[in-house]
Regions:
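N-terminal cap/lid segment of alpha/beta-hydrolase-fold proteins
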Residues: 1-32
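C-terminal catalytic histidine-bearing segment of alpha/beta-hydrolase fold enzymes
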Residues: 202-250
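Mobile cap/lid helix-loop segments that gate and shape the active-site cleft of serine hydrolases
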Residues: 8, 142-177, 183
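Primarily recognizes the serine-hydrolase "nucleophile elbow" in alpha/beta-hydrolase
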Residues: 90-155, 169-170
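Short beta-strand element of the alpha/beta-hydrolase
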Residues: 34-43
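Short beta-strand/loop motif that positions the catalytic acidic residue
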Residues: 181, 187-189, 193
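Catalytic nucleophile-loop/oxyanion-hole region of alpha/beta-hydrolase
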Residues: 50-59, 70-106, 230-238
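Conserved alpha/beta-hydrolase "acid-adjacent" motif
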Residues: 194-203
């Protein structure tokens, strides 16, 4: 595939989600200055992955902005949170190791996610060591909380297991984990989202502002959950313009 590096996982089983983690790298046109990059984590409730409209379909947009798009096919946790977390960390590590080859800036690698993939992205943004913290985070209709009041039950069970303690749920409710190392954020969602309630985003945005972390949040009047790059999302053009404008602020 043109402008693509990396390998595609073989033997993907959609029912068992039995595959090796992989990345597909889309590089922008060559320039004298090293490019920024973004690791993209598709959603799917930690039970499957929406690789197209929450993954590969975003590569042209980022390449047009001069940003490398690195789409991550991460493994499902099945109750073991370390599995997808380690895949995300390894993607960042691998991108840094290949920064010279890909002409990207190793200090300007961000992370992006959708729904449960946004929980993974925000977990990396709040839990990673300083060495692996992303430079920015982009979250679409994110699962943020693992607590029963606001959290997405299916994602919580898949990520933490059936018998997760309240203490463990709080540890991975990322509105509680924002600190001075947490990167700037772009958050977008729909007001009528019934899949992942808007309070996830609102609480995370509030936590970022309490720590004086730069953040922008856009709540569209309608659209529900899971629109990604779909043409059917009524506010798609506005969303892309706002994301483009945000990316130009740093």
């Amino acid at each position: 595939m043109p402008n693509t590096n990396g390998m595609e996982a073989q033997g993907y089983d959609d029912k068992k989600n039995n595959f090796k983690p992989s990345i597909r790298v889309y590089l922008p046109k060559a320039s004298q200055q090293p490019a920024r990059a973004v690791i993209i984590c598709p959603g799917g409730g930690y039970g499957h992955l929406a690789m197209a409209h929450e993954g590969y379909d975003w590569a042209p947009f980022f390449n047009e902005q001069g940003i490398a798009a690195i789409v991550l096919k991460y493994r499902m946790p099945n109750g073991n949170r370390e599995v997808p977390m380690s895949d995300a960390y390894e993607a960042i590590r691998y991108a840094k190791e290949h920064a010279s080859e890909w002409n990207i800036n190793p200090d300007c690698i961000g992370i992006m996610g959708f729904s449960a993939g946004a929980h993974l992205a925000s977990t990396v943004a709040t839990h990673a060591s300083e060495e692996l913290r992303p430079a920015f985070q982009i979250l679409f209709y994110p699962v943020i909380s693992m607590e029963s009041k606001y959290g997405h039950g299916g994602s919580c069970r898949q990520f933490l297991g059936e018998r997760a303690t309240e203490e463990l749920k709080k540890e991975f409710s990322n509105e509680y984990q924002v600190d001075s190392l947490t990167p700037r954020a772009f958050i977008a969602l729909s007001d009528d989202d019934r899949g992942v309630v808007p309070m996830n985003s609102i609480r995370y945005y509030s936590a970022l502002k309490e720590k004086e972390i730069p953040a922008a949040m856009y709540i569209y009047p309608s659209g529900g959950h899971g629109w990604g790059m779909k043409d059917s999302f009524k506010f798609r053009n506005e969303m892309l313009m706002e994301l483009k404008a945000w990316l130009m602020t740093f």
